[in-house]
Amino acid sequence: MCSIFECLLITAGYFLQSKGHCENCLKANRDPPKYHQEGFETRWSWSYVNYTWPSYDEYLDAAVSGRYLPQNILLGGPRVYQDKVYVTMPKYRIGVPASLGFFPLVSLEKTNILITPFPSWEMNHQGECRNLQSVIATEIDRQGIMWVLDGHRSSNYINGIRCPAKMVLMDLNRRGAVIQVVTFPNEISLKDGGFLNDLVIDETDGTYVYITDNSAIDPGLVVYSYNQNRAWKLRDGSMFPQVSASGYVIDNGFRIDYLGTIDGLALSPFTDIAPRLLFYTPLTSNQLFCVTTDILKDQQLASNQTWRRYVKFVGEKQGSTDGMVMDNKGNLYYGLIPQSAVAKWNIFEPLKTAEIIHRNPKTMVWPDSFSMDLQGNLFLVTDHAHRFFVNNNTLLFTPDEIKFRIHVIHVGTRSYMYSFSENFQK
């Protein structure tokens, strides 16, 4: 039986010269890194989020007026670039004054470190659609451009302004200068109910971005072509919840009955011998699917729905997943929400070989927002997200309870944006 990788190469019409050559090539590329894994370290933690305010008076005014309600702020999306860690604070509820920010990578503070709004307080002001409204996720490409997903449109009623979903490109080498704003029309992401959730960047054929729309009304996979400055959306039954995967209990008895659509996604590393693979999974599902990127890039296939025949069911994971990421050796790291755990699977092996590499019911509650730096480190956040998006759950200000943790582990590889042969910077 062929591996999922070999099967998809054949399906897409790409043939290797010989099976022996294929096995030797893949074996060379999947050798484990020669770096010791020390286990996950909790690098930073927060019991609540606060900001570097322009003045003490502005802080007091925000607290008194309700513009700043610390119990309502969720912290997620860590991305490391140079000397900063960028984080997101989506507006699931009122009282979130800034949706994108950063803190220093090197600091003596490890608990409740203050967040500086990025690129400015003004850009985070919710009164105008040109500003950031509710950022869920970001990704930073190899040139230092941050692709910011401002597409959580369930928050429009919170902001009091109906803004279309958008993606903002910021140059981190120029203090976050905005170089492009991509506004998505309603047929791509709903102005009321859209939920652009996660993204990966494919710097081939002029750069493409693949985005999951976790909308409960119109879920799908959005493809954006940078060269064409065009977007299209693919919809399929594989992107809907698996009802049997709900009803699990985490976080000291919190039952999760939420039915979430397509959410986590990961892109295989670049290789000269085949198109890349995009893996995705609904939030409420044990099922993992994939499709080759040459199919996704073909807008004509997307428009006539024939692309669906190329969607492949990879197999069953150990549980539901929110965040995931792939390194440049084909290792998929993904969260397991029901188990409060993180798992690892190499895509050149059967999915049944996947293993749980860390589990902790106290500190690994809702693992999400996986990312990698240039030094071979894997980052993720645990953020108790379930407490925020369940509307009937009352949030209290509990400054003694740690709610958000950014964990780090050294894996000795680079992110999916790099080829097999590129090693991390020591």
Set out the residue ranges of the language-model regions.
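Beta-propeller domains
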Residues: L26-Y68, Q82-M123, Y157-N159, C163, ...
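Beta-rich, blade/repeat-based domains predominating
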Residues: Y68-Q82, Q126-L149, E187-V209, F240-L277, ...
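Beta-propeller blade signature
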Residues: S99-S107, R162-R174, V223-N227, L395-T413
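Short loop/turn segments immediately following beta-strands, especially the blade-tip
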Residues: P104-E109, L172-R174, Y226-A231, V291-A302, ...
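Blade-loop segments of beta-propeller domains
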Residues: V106-W147, G151-S155, G160, V182-E187
